[in-house]
Amino acid sequence: MTLTRREFIKHSGIAAGTLVVTSAAPLPAWAEEKGGKILTAGRWGAMNVEVKDGKIVSSTGALAKTIPNSLQSTAADQVHTTARIQHPMVRKSYLDNPLQPVKGRGEDTYVQVSWEQALKLIHEQHDRIRKANGPSAIFAGSYGWRSSGVLHKAQTLLQRYMNLAGGYSGHSGDYSTGAAQVIMPHVVGSVEVYEQQTSWPLILENSQVVVLWGMNPLNTLKIAWSSTDEQGLEYFHQLKKSGKPVIAIDPIRSETIEFFGDNATWIAPNMGTDVALMLGIAHTLMTQGKHDKVFLEKYTTGYPQFEEYLTGKSDNTPKSAAWAAEITGVPEAQIVKLAELMAANRTMLMAGWGIQRQQYGEQKHWMLVTLAAMLGQIGTPGGGFGFSYHYSNGGNPTRVGGVLPEMSAAIAGQASEAADDGGMTAIPVARIVDALENPGGKYQHNGKEQTYPNIKMIWWAGGGNFTHHQDTNRLIKAWQKPEMIVVSECYWTAAAKHADIVLPITTSFERNDLTMTGDYSNQHIVLMKQAVAPQFEARNDFDVFADLAELLKPGGKEIYTEGKDEMAWLKFFYDAAQKGARAQRVTMPMFNAFWQQNKLIEMRRSEKNEQYIRYGDFRADPVKNALGTPSGKIEIYSRTLEKFGYKDCPAHPTWLAPDEWKGTADEKQLQLLTAHPAHRLHSQLNYAELRKKYAVADREPITIHTEDAARFGIANGDLVRVWNKRGQILTGAVVTDGIKKGVVCVHEGAWPDLENGLCKNGSANVLTADIPSSQLANACAGNSALVYIEKYTGNALKLTAFDQPAVQA
C-alpha cells in the first residue's frame, strides 16, 4: 500500500524474500588482514569503516570529494551510542494486562523480556485484533528512516509480513513532498519531484542564471534515498567556480548562500509568500510583453484563464510587483529586476521542497512551473525548472550498467485476500493523527471521498514519527488510542518510549547488504559488509518477521524467506544487476569475487545521458511526446481540479494566505522556519558527537535576527523559550543578520524530550500545526506556524532525550 521514493525513481521492484538467521554471521577474516578497514555505505555515501577489538573506531568517506560530509564520521556513534535499545522490552502495564493497561504510553516503566516472550505476545495480540477488526485495523505504514540496502529495509519487511498475515492499512505520499507529488501529475503528468533533471553538464554549459528557490543543497545533498554518489555537491562547486550569477530566494541565509558568497544575490521574502512573489514576477513579464506567447500557446493549456487572475480581471486585484512587494517584503524594484533578469537570460529555476511543506503548499510548485512556462525555456539546455537538484544528486547523468533490484513487500506466489476483498487501505501519511482521532471519518483526497480506518494496532519499524509529525502534544494524545503499539528500532527514540513492545534491531553495520549510489545516476554498486557483531540482543528485521511468519502458520518462515538466506538474496540481487549490465555490454565480476574484493563498482558514463534535457522530447514534438495530463500539455488551468471544487486548491495557481503568517501575526509573534539540519538526516544522528558542532547551551539552536533578539532582550548563547498554543520548547540563541526579520529558525529533527510540558531538547514539531496542505494532497504544513520567544530564566533542565527509559528490575 506504500509507493516509495525508490519506486518513483527506479520504477523497478522484485518479489523477493529475506534473510532468516538465528545467529550473527562471522566477521570476514579479510577485515583483520587488511587492517580492519571495511567498505560499506549509508545514506550519506560509501564509507570505509575501521574496526578494532570488535568495535568501530572511525569512519570516512570512500569517494573523492571537494566538500566534506560530516555525516560520514558517525558510524561509531550509530553502533555504540548509549541510546541503543539493548533488549526486548514491554511496557509494565501492558505486560500485566494487554487488554487494559493501567498507565498510559509514555508514563510507564519497561520490563525486559526474552525474544520468545516478546514475539509470542505480539503474535497473540496481533491475531486477536486482526480477527476482531479485520486487516484495516492494523496500521503498518511505518513511515520513516531506512537502511540504504536493497535487502534490509525495515518498512518493506514489516509490510511483507503483514501481507502474509492478511493485509494492513498503509500510507500514501511522504512528508518531504506530500503536496507537490499530488499536484504535479495534474500539471505536468508526473510526480516530478523524483524525476531525473536536465544534466549538470548542460547547466554548466548553457545556464546563464541559476535561481535557488527555497533550497539548501549544501545540507540536503549530504544524503540520498539510497546512498549519495556525492556528485551534486561537486557540480555546485563547479557552478560556483564558473562565476555564473546565482539568485537565492530563502528567508534564511543558508550554508549554500554563504558558500556562493559574492556570486549569490540573497532575496529573503516573508515566509509562505513565494506564490505572491512568483505572481509579481509573472505580472511584470506579462505587462512588459516578455512572456513567451508562442510557448504558452503550443505547450500549455489554460493560460488565458490564469492571465485573467494575474491581471485582476477575475478578482479586481492585479498581481503586480507592487502588490507582491506588500505581501512578500521584497521591494517592488527588486521584483521587477528579477523578472527582467530571468527573461533576458537562459534561466534555470531550481526549487526545493520546504516551500510546499506549508498550508496551500500545492500552489508553490504549480506556480513555479507556470512561471517557467511564461519564460518559455522549458525543454531547452540549461533552462526551465527542476525540483530535485537538491536531492539525491539529481542532474548527475544516469550511468549505463547494472541496477540492483530491491526487496518487495509482495511474496512470490502469495496474494493477500484482504487486497482482493478491499480490506486494505492507505491514508495520506501526514494524516495519521486525524485517522486515530476520527475512526470511520470521511475526508476528501485528490478528488475522492475516503474513509479513515479504525486503527487498533500500530507497528512502526525503524521510523521517528514523533520527530517528523507535526504538533507533538496532539500526537501523544492520539497515540493512546490503539490497543497495541509495537516499535522495532535501533534507538530509544520518543516513539519507542511511547510503545507497548519495543524490539532491538541491528544497524546496517551489523549485517550484510548491497546498495547503489545515486538514485538518478546509478553510478556505483557498493557492498555493505557487516563490520561488527550485533550489539546486545539486537536482531535483523528479517529474523524477527520470519519468526513471526512461522507463528502465523506452519511453514510461514519458508514462505516469507522463499528459502533464501542473507547471502543467497544478495547474490540474487547482484546477479540480476549483472544480467542487466551484460545486456548493455558492461562487465561486472562474479558475485563471490566482487564480495571478496572490498571495492565498489562504477558504471559506465553515457554521452547520451550527459545531454539529457528534462522535457526536451516534449518540446521537440509535443504531440508524439505528450505529457500524462488530460490535455497532454502543461496545465496552467486544470479542468480536473475545477471539477473537484476545492476552495483550498483552485483550478489555477493562486495566492492563498495561510492561517499563520506575518499577515495574521500580532506584534510579538514571529514566523517559524523548520529547515533541514546541517549535521543530521532529520532526526537521525541527533544523539551523535556531531551534536557538539551545533548545540547551543546543550539545546537545539534557534536562529534569531539581531533586531528581534534585541527587542526581546536575547543575547547570543542565551536559553530561549519558544511557545505557542500547541506547546513550548527550550532552545539556544544564535543571533545574526542572516535571517529575515520576523522569522526564527529551529531546524527540524531534534528528539522530543518533554518535562512538565516543556521540550528540553528543542523539537520544532512541538510548535508546528498538524493541518493538511489542502483537501487535494492532505500533506504536512510544518512551515506555517507563528511563535513567541523570550529569554528563559527558569531552572536549567537536564536533557534526557537520549537516555534509556526507566526499567523495572
Swiss-Prot record:
Catalysed reactions, semicolon-separated: trimethylamine + 2 Fe(III)-[cytochrome c] + H2O = trimethylamine N-oxide + 2 Fe(II)-[cytochrome c] + 3 H(+)
Record-linked InterPro entries: Asp_de-COase-like_dom_sf (IPR009010), BisC (IPR006658), CT_DMSOR/BSOR/TMAOR (IPR041954), Molybdopterin_N (IPR041460), MoPterin_dinucl-bd_dom (IPR006657), Mopterin_OxRdtase (IPR006656), Mopterin_OxRdtase_prok_CS (IPR006655), Prok_Mopterin_Oxidored (IPR050612)
Subcellular location: Periplasm
Keywords: Metal-binding, Molybdenum, Oxidoreductase, Periplasm, Signal
Residues involved in Mo-bis(molybdopterin guanine dinucleotide) binding: S176
Gene3D superfamilies in the record: 2.40.40.20, 3.40.50.740, Dimethylsulfoxide Reductase, domain 2 (3.40.228.10), Dimethylsulfoxide Reductase, domain 3 (3.90.55.10)
Named cofactor requirement(s): Mo-bis(molybdopterin guanine dinucleotide)
Signal sequence, start to end: 1-31
The EC number(s) this enzyme carries: 1.7.2.3
Any one GO CC term of the record: outer membrane-bounded periplasmic space
Modification(s) after translation: Predicted to be exported by the Tat system. The position of the signal peptide cleavage has not been experimentally proven.
Cofactor annotation comment: Binds 1 molybdenum-bis(molybdopterin guanine dinucleotide) (Mo-bis-MGD) cofactor per subunit.
CDD domains assigned: MopB_CT_DMSOR-BSOR-TMAOR, MopB_DMSOR-BSOR-TMAOR
PANTHER family named in the record: TRIMETHYLAMINE-N-OXIDE REDUCTASE (PTHR43742), TRIMETHYLAMINE-N-OXIDE REDUCTASE 2 (PTHR43742:SF10)
Note: Expression of torYZ allows E.coli to grow anaerobically on a wider range of substrates than does expression of torCAD.
Family: Belongs to the prokaryotic molybdopterin-containing oxidoreductase family.
Protein function: Reduces trimethylamine-N-oxide (TMAO) into trimethylamine; an anaerobic reaction coupled to energy-yielding reactions. Can also reduce other N- and S-oxide compounds such as 4-methylmorpholine-N-oxide and biotin sulfoxide (BSO), but with a lower catalytic efficiency.
The protein's name in its UniProt record: Trimethylamine-N-oxide reductase 2
Annotated source species: Escherichia coli O6:H1 (strain CFT073 / ATCC 700928 / UPEC)
